[in-house]
């Protein structure tokens, strides 16, 4: 069952980030964070430092997108 993970970190450019992702395992959440931050800000993995990965409840989530994903039972792709 997927869980919501809060990922906190910073980059070598001085930017701090807090991101919420839905993933099965903490490792998958870290990979998703590397992908999202890297693509949004054109950074490599070596430039991204992840400080904390914590599972959170759906009530604690700030992102509406994450809340909607957790509320859906099944996703169909056509």
UniProtKB/Swiss-Prot annotation:
InterPro entries: Ribosomal_eL20 (IPR028877), Ribosomal_eL20_dom (IPR023573). The keyword rRNA-binding applies. One of its GO terms (cellular component) is ribonucleoprotein complex. Gene3D superfamilies: 3.10.20.10. One of its GO terms (biological process) is translation. One of its GO terms (molecular function) is large ribosomal subunit rRNA binding. It comes from the Archaea. It holds the Pfam family Ribosomal_L18A. Keywords: Ribonucleoprotein, Ribosomal protein, RNA-binding, rRNA-binding. Belongs to the eukaryotic ribosomal protein eL20 family. Part of the 50S ribosomal subunit. Binds 23S rRNA. This is Large ribosomal subunit protein eL20. It comes from Pyrobaculum arsenaticum (strain DSM 13514 / JCM 11321 / PZ6).
